[in-house]
Amino acid sequence: MSKPVILTYEGLKKLEEELEYLKTVKRAEVAEKIKQARAFGDLSENSEYDEAKNEQAFIEGRIATLEAMLKNAKVIDEEDIKLDEVSIGCTVKVFDETYNEEVEYTIVGSAEADPMNNKISDESPIGKALLGKKVGETISVEVPAGVIKLKILEIRR
């Protein structure tokens, strides 16, 4: 059996929307590009055709990936998110003692991680270190830039 893909409800909706978009809009666009490229004649030296076929392969691969992820999805119910300790689906406010600043992270499954928006995977160094910890605890985490110290200030949904 495949490993479950842990998602928040929001993450599930985003993946479903992406899948729908790829199946309805992008498939049709690429099919049209292939049709137009075929009209140019000789396919052996037709870069437009090759490009469209590569795009089609990428889209079909992404569709297959999304379908597999959704098939194995385990959605975290907001009511199941514990607030007494850090768990997947919660938002954690920490004080970064190394850089002397407050930072908020939302702990999510790796499928919906988006570090640029402070959504970090439960498998990332910081996410892994925060899991199971409580407000008031301080942790040291080894990250690519070195070791950072984080004090947990707040846990919420």
UniProtKB/Swiss-Prot annotation:
Pfam family name, one: GreA_GreB
| Entry keyword Cytoplasm | no
Q: Name one GO molecular function term.
A: RNA polymerase binding
One annotated GO biological process: DNA-templated transcription elongation
Q: Which UniProt keywords apply?
A: Coiled coil, DNA-binding, Transcription, Transcription regulation
| PROSITE patterns on file | GREAB_1, GREAB_2
Coiled coil start-end? 12-74
Q: Which family does it belong to?
A: Belongs to the GreA/GreB family.
The protein's role, per its UniProt record: Necessary for efficient RNA polymerase transcription elongation past template-encoded arresting sites. The arresting sites in DNA have the property of trapping a certain fraction of elongating RNA polymerases that pass through, resulting in locked ternary complexes. Cleavage of the nascent transcript by cleavage factors such as GreA or GreB allows the resumption of elongation from the new 3'terminus. GreA releases sequences of 2 to 3 nucleotides.
Q: What is this protein called?
A: Transcription elongation factor GreA
Q: Which organism is it from?
A: Caldanaerobacter subterraneus subsp. tengcongensis (strain DSM 15242 / JCM 11007 / NBRC 100824 / MB4)
